[in-house]
Amino acid sequence: MKNTIEHPKVFISYAWGSEDYRLKVRSLATDLMGDGIDVLLDQWSLKEGNDTYAFMEQSVTDSTITNVLILLDPIYEKKANGRHGGVGTETQIISPEIYNKVKQEKFLPVIFERGENGEIPKPQYLKTMLHF
């Protein structure tokens, strides 16, 4: 059964940074849940022995996920553009979805942390998308 907008479910895509940064991500997820949004977050869902890449692929392609919140920061931008780590894997999965569906609303870029000089750290595949 597919979720409706009345009961949204989001997956949070982000680059692992410092422990403080992961706490900030977890705080956002907790706030969203407090607002009635189901949240899929690796910090809560992945367990020892799980395949992280399979988790990312399933989370991004899951039809019950109404939105993928892409939390942008300089580390995310660098990893996405270089196709490194988990962010690079997610970028390879997400970018065709964005390019093939010009009016898509599932993948939402969120400026979570700006660069040192206040710049918006958008990876190349998100450059033309409006952001939060």
Model-identified regions with their sequence ranges:
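Hydrophobic/aromatic beta-strand patches that form the interior of the parallel beta-sheet core
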Residues: 69, 106-110, 130-132
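Short beta-alpha junction loops
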Residues: 45, 74-76, 110-117
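Conserved TIR/SEFIR loop-to-helix hotspot centered on a Trp-containing motif
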Residues: 51, 74-100
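Alpha-helical scaffold elements adjacent to nucleotide-binding pockets in ATP/GTP-utilizing enzyme cores
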Residues: 27-28, 55, 59, 86-93, ...
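Conserved N-terminal substructure of TIR/SEFIR domains
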Residues: 1-74, 100-103
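Short catalytic/ligand-binding loop motif for oxyanion handling, primarily in non-cytosolic enzymes
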Residues: 20, 77-80, 116-121
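Short, electropositive alpha-helical surface patch
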Residues: 119-132
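Catalytic micro-motifs at enzyme active sites that drive phosphoryl/nucleotidyl and oxygen chemistry
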Residues: 56-57, 96-98, 117-122
